[in-house]
Amino acid sequence: MSAIDKLVKASHLIDMNDIIREGNPTLRKVAEEVTFPLSEKEEILGEKMMQFLKHSQDPIMAEKLGLRGGVGLAAPQLDISKRIIAVLVPNVEDAQGNPPKEAYSLQEVMYNPKVVSHSVQDAALSDGEGCLSVDREVPGYVVRHARVTIEYFDKTGEKHRLKLKGYNSIVVQHEIDHIDGIMFYDRINEKNPFAVKEGLLILE
């Protein structure tokens, strides 16, 4: 049974055992574009990927399924070399502890996403990045574009253009890297992991 056949079964919930780890060659391949109309399996896969992210952010489901929390997942991490990503970035409480009006700042399954333009300025998360396919900490600034404009297709084949900045920009770039065979630590300065070039925006 292929990876996608297993994952799209109605009874299957994606868990950490389905996620391949660094060293697996699929993570270093440039994934193939999907064509439209999508196959039923490709559509269900996108839904399952989003379901995994929701489960990973739900304390009860995460404990039950043994999940690490995640805000993004790419099909190659499931050993499926297709250009499909899911992103789910929760909003946080305000300074007074009030819940956000919208639960998520970004919630989307993207097919064939690509960066079409970006800022000159670079940015990095102050705490570095992690990855569901990497079971170790890799300290250092992961240097990315501070702002990007992306294009992607939804499951119906409709094309979207989105401008992103801040954390959402970082998350989407991390996932697009996965479909291009790039790992986050490829973008860390090997000799000086916390090197700060002039103009680098550090995001807290």
Swiss-Prot record:
InterPro entries: Peptide_deformylase, Peptide_deformylase_sf. Pfam families: Pep_deformylase. It is an enzyme of class 3 (hydrolase). Its EC number is 3.5.1.88. Keywords: Hydrolase, Iron, Metal-binding, Protein biosynthesis. The keyword DNA repair does not apply. Fe cation binds at residues 131, 174, 178. Its cofactor is Fe(2+). It catalyses: N-terminal N-formyl-L-methionyl-[peptide] + H2O = N-terminal L-methionyl-[peptide] + formate. CDD domains: Pep_deformylase. The keyword Metal-binding applies. One of its GO terms (biological process) is co-translational protein modification. Binds 1 Fe(2+) ion. One of its GO terms (molecular function) is metal ion binding. Gene3D superfamilies: Peptide deformylase (3.90.45.10). The active site is at 175. Removes the formyl group from the N-terminal Met of newly synthesized proteins. Requires at least a dipeptide for an efficient rate of reaction. N-terminal L-methionine is a prerequisite for activity but the enzyme has broad specificity at other positions. Belongs to the polypeptide deformylase family. This is Peptide deformylase. The gene is def.
